[in-house]
A protein has these predicted regions:
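NAD(P)-dependent dehydrogenases' Rossmann-like dinucleotide-binding region
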Residues: 1-8
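Oxidoreductase and adenylate-handling cofactor-binding alpha/beta cores
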Residues: 8-20, 50-64, 159
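Substrate-binding/catalytic subdomain of NAD(P)-dependent oxidoreductase enzymes
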Residues: 25-122, 127-129
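Catalytic-loop motifs flanking and including active-site residues across diverse enzymes
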Residues: 48, 152-155
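A structural signal for short secondary-structure junctions
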Residues: 123-126, 134-136, 188-193
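An anion-binding loop in the catalytic cleft
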Residues: 132-139, 157
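Glycine-rich phosphate/pyrophosphate-binding beta-alpha loops
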Residues: 138-150
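A conserved regulatory-domain signal marking ACT and ACT-like small-molecule sensing domains
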Residues: 155, 160-195
């Protein structure tokens, strides 16, 4: 599970913590440089779906195409949705989720209700985060800035350096870091994989 779009997270945080409408929170995100003039890819879940496709390749060895990923954005949420969720003890976050069983992987992006105590529910502002679950360690959370000029420029420069020094060709697939790579995994709807 992860919050893979800092713009959407900023908007949802502003709506929850300051009672802003969706339109007002989006306008503020644009003013601060977190959202593009056309924010469609951020708010409809497309950007998160693209990032989830990359993560699925790394984690499961599955070459998912973003259009194969079920998605729903935050652009239909309003202040009442946020308020009702809060009254019930929940926070709404746009989550990218991946599950797998022995033969299939399910990939999904949608607004999700998380209990206020959930680690991902506590990620605020223009931050991204990924929660990873391990048998021994339990839940671990990795988070950092996810929108704006600084984080974007930093990522681009890091990618250019990787290309310049030849690190970009060392992919997880080439290194065969997972045992199930290339064994016929299919991408299925979430309800078929997740129990």
């Amino acid at each position: 599970q992860g919050i893979l779009n800092g713009t959407s997270n900023f908007i949802l945080t502003a709506m929850a913590e300051r009672g802003l409408s969706y339109a007002a929170a989006l306008a503020e995100a644009q003013k601060l440089g977190y959202a593009e003039a056309d924010p469609t890819l951020d708010v409809d879940g497309s950007d998160a779906a693209h990032k989830l496709a990359v993560l699925a390749q790394i984690a499961f060895g599955v070459a998912a195409k973003p259009h194969e990923i079920e998605r729903q954005g935050i652009d239909t949420l309003d202040a009442m949705d946020i308020r009702f969720a809060d009254e019930l003890g929940y926070t709404i976050k746009l989550l990218a989720e991946a599950w797998s069983d022995d033969t299939a992987v399910a990939l999904h992006v949608a607004p999700v209700l998380l209990r206020h105590t959930d680690l991902l529910a506590q990620v605020r502002g223009a931050y991204n985060a990924i929660a990873v679950y391990g048998d021994v360690v339990g839940e671990t959370l990795y988070q950092g800035p996810g929108a704006g000029r600084g984080p974007t420029a930093s990522s681009v420069v890091a990618d250019l350096i990787d290309l310049a020094v030849g690190r970009a060709q060392r992919t997880f697939a080439a290194a065969r870091l997972w045992s199930r790579a290339g064994k016929g995994f299919t991408i299925e709807p979430a309800e078929r994989v997740r129990s």
